[in-house]
Amino acid sequence: MRVVFMGTPEFAVAVLRQIVEAGWDVAAAYTQPDKPKNRGMKLVPTPVKEYALTQNIPVYQPQSCRDEAVLEELRALEPDVIVVAAYGKLLPQALLDIPKVAIINVHSSILPQYRGAAPINWAILNGEKETGVTIKIGRASCRERV
């Protein structure tokens, strides 16, 4: 199974690590561009970039996934599956149509509750006693409370 992974924060690293440990062929990791941080405004790589490089996975950091050149680059990777976990931006339909088999979205809440950004933070701020993860494959969803 040829996979392209898309994610940015530590939550996404946990998902990517499971894919790597399962022995899937990870063709590339897409993540947000490095951002300047701290007083020196030094560019800091995303957690996904740092992990992917330790696994010799090619890393792509496009400004936008709506750019036709980025979509062509992704098509050239010929993914069977694209796995998305906390990528950080909405993905265009043209990208969702690229994988041969499916696009899999891993979201850190039980959808539809806390859809969008920072679902774990919102669950904590709202004092939730339990939360969970939703794994969406194409149009189907699997939810598990934790």
Where are these regions (language model features)?
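One-carbon transfer enzymes
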Residues: M1-R145
